[in-house]
């Protein structure tokens, strides 16, 4: 799913604590980029059949393509962006019985350090964040059939998943380590060249290249994990 970036010359500005001066329609599909350096994106109602990508060619702070599906309402306040879908029962039936109708693409600006937070869970979602900078990732409500492509970390970056994870794939730069903590047991874990069938209870593992104080990812899963893969890109 392609989104053509809009032309919007950018200038260097410090991180803003007040809304950018440009106005935008909260029912539109784009938010102009205005020099922001850090943003938090929150999707409070869950997400399915979607991709979220940091695009090196993006000119907007955020752009959304929903095909024929319902569009979210955008809320922008200082360093906070929130996307809210107003689902009606008829929309839900249409999405269920029409394959591909609910596919969503969310494109983010590459010059921003992003914190992303999902509530309500993720299902069949691709998060390609490899071309940007990420400060934190939070997923509440569990996730299933999710692929997460990570950029080089600038610090120790937490990834928190509550509600369990199944069919979760994580790719990171070859030189980047990942620490893993799981509460609730693991079934079918692939950690680079290592494979484990099952671990009961709580587990603490890492990729073998995690050093205290050196930038890496810290993945914590509450609620158990099944078919979890962590590999180098």
How would you describe each model-predicted region?
Residues 1-30:
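Gly/Pro-rich, low-complexity intrinsically disordered segments
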Residues 41-43:
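Short acidic/polar, Gly/Pro-enriched loop/turn segments located at secondary-structure boundaries
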Residues 109-113, 119-122, 128-143, 151-156, ...:
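Extended beta-solenoid/beta-helix repeat architectures
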């Amino acid at each position: 799913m392609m989104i053509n970036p809009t032309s919007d010359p950018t200038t260097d500005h410090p991180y803003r604590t007040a809304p950018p001066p440009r106005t935008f329609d909260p029912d539109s599909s784009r938010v102009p980029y205005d020099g922001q350096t850090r943003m938090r994106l929150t999707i409070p109602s869950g997400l399915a059949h979607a991709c979220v990508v940091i695009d090196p060619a993006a000119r907007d702070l955020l752009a959304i393509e929903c095909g024929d599906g319902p569009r979210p309402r955008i809320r922008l306040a200082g360093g906070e962006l929130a996307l809210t879908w107003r689902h009606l029962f008829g929309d839900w039936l249409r999405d269920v019985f029409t394959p591909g109708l609910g596919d969503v693409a969310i494109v983010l600006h590459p010059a921003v350090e992003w914190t992303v937070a999902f509530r309500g869970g993720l299902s069949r979602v691709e998060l390609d964040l490899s071309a940007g900078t990420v400060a934190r990732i939070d997923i509440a409500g569990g996730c299933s059939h999710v692929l997460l492509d990570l950029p080089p970390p600038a610090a120790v970056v937490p990834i928190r998943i509550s509600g369990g994870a199944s069919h979760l794939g994580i790719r990171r730069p070859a030189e980047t380590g990942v620490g893993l903590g799981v509460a609730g047991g693991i079934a079918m874990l692939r950690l680079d060249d290592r494979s484990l069938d099952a671990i009961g209870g709580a587990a603490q593992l890492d990729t073998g290249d995690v050093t205290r104080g050196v930038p890496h990812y810290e993945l914590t899963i509450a609620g158990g994990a099944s078919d979890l893969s962590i590999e180098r890109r």
